[in-house]
Amino acid sequence: MFTGSIVALVTPMDDKGNVCRASLKKLIDYHVASGTSAIVSVGTTGESATLSHDEHGDVVLLTLELADGRIPIIAGTGANATAEGVCLTKRFENSGVVGCLTVTPYYNRPTQEGLYQHFKTIAENTELPQMLYNVPSRTGTDLLPETVGRLAKIKNIIGIKEAIGNLSRVSQIQQLVNDDFVLVSGDDATSLDFMQLGGHGVISVTANIAAREMVELCALARQGNFAQARLLNQRLMHLHQKLFVEPNPIPVKWAAKRLGLIATDTLRLPMTPLTDAGCSVVEQALKDAALL
């Protein structure tokens, strides 16, 4: 459940900015039918930063309800205050989630010791499996391999989503952890190379709109069929890249609406709709990927 193509799911909203139950159900059904390994609910792509604390929990619980056991759900539980991270994680204890994805604290930029103590404290306050999430471009803090190695010794810290974009991190981390520690990419554009170096999959933005393709890509990579995987990835590369023509999740929400997967591309301020220029770029990327 922590390997293969895991979707970083968008949080669909109606025209008024309220969570849209019907669109969320449609998305979940799409991923069940496509064979997606698991859903991350309310991560970065799910607009965790603009949902209230209560809404955050409510969306995860609604996702669990609508999934109804058909696909594993991983809860996004990142916070830049350790106590809040503990509180959010505890809300999902015994809820049915299979684990939590916990981003490094953002904005306050803790030291490596602070990062270690943050994740250690959260892990010690739950039985839920914890997956670390390193994305320095958003948080301003880099979780270094040595710190990951220390954290990997904690029994319920089971892996990391590594989105630094530096492929050397795969081997650096592998040298410091046991073989059962899960390494997944957080960058669609480099995810195939990440898997070829020994990674186990990807937590994917692209999978929101190309679920079957990302499932196939990961399956080919896990089988060692990198020649076929590269052919597929070449078709998707423009899409991987152009889904970030404006800040995530602006482009992918527009694309999901364009493909009829969600009813609107509504976002919460300060996120604003995709510009006309961005729409043209993403439209072409969808065509290049043979999705239109």
Curated annotation (Swiss-Prot):
Cellular compartment(s): Cytoplasm
Species, as recorded: Erwinia tasmaniensis (strain DSM 17950 / CFBP 7177 / CIP 109463 / NCPPB 4357 / Et1/99)
SUPFAM superfamilies per record: Aldolase
GO BP terms, alphabetized: diaminopimelate biosynthetic process; lysine biosynthetic process via diaminopimelate
Keyword field: Amino-acid biosynthesis, Cytoplasm, Diaminopimelate biosynthesis, Lyase, Lysine biosynthesis, Schiff base
GO cellular component: cytosol
Biological function: Catalyzes the condensation of (S)-aspartate-beta-semialdehyde [(S)-ASA] and pyruvate to 4-hydroxy-tetrahydrodipicolinate (HTPA).
Gene symbol of the encoding locus: dapA
Enzyme class: lyase
Record protein name field: 4-hydroxy-tetrahydrodipicolinate synthase
Annotated family: Belongs to the DapA family.
One GO MF term attached to the UniProt entry: 4-hydroxy-tetrahydrodipicolinate synthase activity
Principal subcellular localisation of the protein: cytoplasm
